[in-house]
């Protein structure tokens, strides 16, 4: 809904189809969003529409305390990332801001992806063959990814615990400049 911009109401059925969720899941989610004061609903014929109370950055600011960090676990690997992975973390931020590129590239991969089974985790302290860090995500980053990178909102949530002032400053600037 944050990426919907000013395009108007979202039909629940369409949201469920687009996100690969059941109508029951969307109904539960919309009930939670209503309780948080982020949306209202109205009936349009047989369809139920969700309408956000705000749009763009203002909606993000209202919602961010309710959003989750998508990263369940980060592992280090010595192989090139799988084609199902997306540039994430400081690597993604560095490509969109003035932040320097991290020494080790960071990618996101859905934790339930078949590609995860083929990865061999290594200890970055002992293995010099480190190629990348893989963030295993709670949901598929492909849902919102753009141009081979994770989406901005998921990126912001994944970096929310990062205490580096440079990272937070660049992230804030990126969020404010983003064309919602």
Placement of each model-derived feature along the sequence:
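Short amphipathic alpha-helical interaction segments
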Residues: 20-35
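Short gly/pro-enriched beta-turn/loop segments at secondary-structure junctions
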Residues: 10, 45-46
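Short acidic, hydrophobic short linear motifs in intrinsically disordered regions
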Residues: 6-19
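Long, low-complexity, charge-rich intrinsically disordered regions
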Residues: 62-180
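Minor-groove-contacting beta-hairpin "wing" of winged helix-turn-helix DNA-binding domains
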Residues: 46-54
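A short, conserved structural fragment
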Residues: 34-45
